[in-house]
Design a protein with these regions (language model features):
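PRPP-associated nucleotide enzymes
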Residues: 1-152
Length: 152
């Protein structure tokens, strides 16, 4: 790890046997566009490696899903292994463009439901990744103003 003027740069080692960095991305519903931009940048970064080894990988994004049942409940599924990886989960709780069917009606996801999807994906990892980092454009539940009365 290299620290330079408050920015932390991680040095990843490209494994010769598996041609892998141990880096993985998961996008929760509504954050796919941001995850794709990050993925494209990582692919160009590792394909232009100056370390003598180049990574030939199509994507860092792991296939995952948060399907919903008819009663509104959901579950988190990860279709690829996360064992030993540095996992970055990208979640956008401010995105109201994601909807789901609830008893025949299309309901937009609230920030609480986005946060629940994040917790479902973390629970689906079963503690197998080396490290889990959550990337959120908006810190959900991080109110920064003064309280006036007895409020949460």
């Amino acid at each position: 790890m290299i620290v330079n003027s408050k920015i932390v740069w991680y040095t990843f080692i490209i494994s010769e046997d598996t041609n892998d960095t141990g880096l993985a991305l998961i996008a929760t519903p509504g954050a796919e566009e941001l995850a794709t931009l990050i993925d494209k940048r990582l692919i160009t970064l590792f394909s232009e490696s100056h370390l003598g080894k180049k990574l030939h990988k199509d994507t860092f994004i792991l296939k995952s899903d948060c399907p919903r049942f008819t009663n509104g409940d959901a579950k988190g599924i990860i279709y690829e292994t996360v064992r030993g990886k540095d996992l970055y989960i990208i979640c956008d709780p401010g995105n109201h463009g994601v909807t789901y069917s609830f008893f025949g009606k299309e309901i937009p996801l609230t920030p609480d439901e986005h946060f629940e999807n994040l917790k479902r994906i973390i629970a689906a990892c079963n503690g197998k990744p080396q490290r889990i980092t959550v990337v959120m454009p908006m810190l959900y539940g991080g109110r920064q103003h003064r309280r006036n009365a007895r409020e949460s």
